[in-house]
């Protein structure tokens, strides 16, 4: 099952208050890099059921993406209790994502 990118983005204060491990994925449904990354992200997340995965549709002027300094898609931001621990831009392998997930879910 593919989760769609949410057009309505959460506020930064809400994200900062999220408990536990969270993966914020910034992208767009029409982005080729984003589509190619989906199987890699799904594979990496399969071993991390406790990680909250939030997909946010990003565009210029979107405040949440700018607050995380997102410039290219997909950008994956890994959070533990609302604090950024890692960021991946256009990940090239599931292993790369798994290493970042291990930092927040362990």
Which ranges hold each PLM region?
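Thiol-based oxidoreductase modules, predominantly thioredoxin-like and allied folds used
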Residues: 5, 26, 49-63
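Short pre-active-site segment immediately N-terminal to redox-active cysteine/selenocysteine motifs
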Residues: 19, 27-30, 72
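Structural signal for short hydrophobic segments within the conserved structured cores
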Residues: 3, 54, 85-88
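Typically the conserved alpha-helix immediately C-terminal to a functionally engaged Cys/Sec
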Residues: 33-47
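The canonical Cys-X-X-Cys-His
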Residues: 31-34, 76
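Structural micro-motif
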Residues: 68-77
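Non-catalytic, surface beta->alpha helical segment in thiol-disulfide oxidoreductase systems
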Residues: 78-106
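N-terminal leader/targeting and pre-domain segments
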Residues: 1-21, 106
């Amino acid at each position: 099952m593919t989760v769609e990118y949410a057009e309505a983005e959460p506020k930064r204060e809400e994200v900062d208050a999220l408990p536990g491990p969270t993966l914020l994925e910034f992208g767009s449904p029409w982005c080729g890099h984003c589509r190619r990354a989906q199987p890699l992200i799904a594979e990496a997340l399969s071993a991390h059921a406790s990680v909250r995965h939030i997909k946010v549709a990003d565009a210029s002027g979107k405040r949440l993406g700018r607050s995380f300094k997102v410039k290219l898609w997909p950008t994956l931001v890994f959070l533990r209790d609302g604090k950024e621990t890692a960021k991946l831009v256009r990940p090239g392998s599931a292993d790369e994502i798994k290493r970042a997930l291990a930092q927040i879910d362990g």
